[in-house]
Amino acid sequence: PMTEAERTDFIRGIRSQTDKLDFLFQALVKTSRLETGVIQLDKKLGRLFDTVAQAMSGIVYAAEKKGIAVSVDCPEDLTVFHDSKWTSEALFNLLDNAVKYTPAGGKIAVSVVLWEMYVEIKVTDTGKGISESNQAAIFRRFYREEEVHEQQGVGIGLYLAREIVTRQGGYIKVVSEPG
């Protein structure tokens, strides 16, 4: 028979694995629906600040837990045509990666700048960086760098982010240097 402590650890492990499976399932469903056109992006004029805030709310706890300082520079009154739900999903995926790969005590910054022809949303962090040879690959479905297999993930978040941004007429890229 199991002790109470063993039972608690066992249940905690089951919950953790269930959460991972749920995350994978949800990511695959979202990707599939987006790719097959089941979900149509619904671009409307809306405040980008609210979309950024929604994405940020999903990573605040994990960032605090690692002691990562998070800052946002986004004009509150900036309105643009975008699908706020899916844009928030794309931004969350970028931020989630930033939290995963930024060491404890690091920094993550989100800045939003209105240019003449487009709006730039930039996520910067003090993470380990991505080698130039891997930069194009990180947006492929299921791609994961060899060195990051200790981190939780399935390699779908950045692919989904790229799909969402591209389907709204946007462009996503990475600028990084290892270290």
Where in the sequence are the language-model features?
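A conserved beta-strand-to-alpha-helix junction within the catalytic ATP-binding
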Residues: D42-S57, S71, V113
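Short helix N-cap motif at coil->helix boundaries in the Bergerat
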Residues: L48, G129-R140
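Short helix-loop "hinge" at the ATP-lid/N-box region of the Bergerat-fold HATPase_c
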Residues: A98-V99
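Short beta-strand/loop element within the Bergerat-fold HATPase_c
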Residues: G105-M117
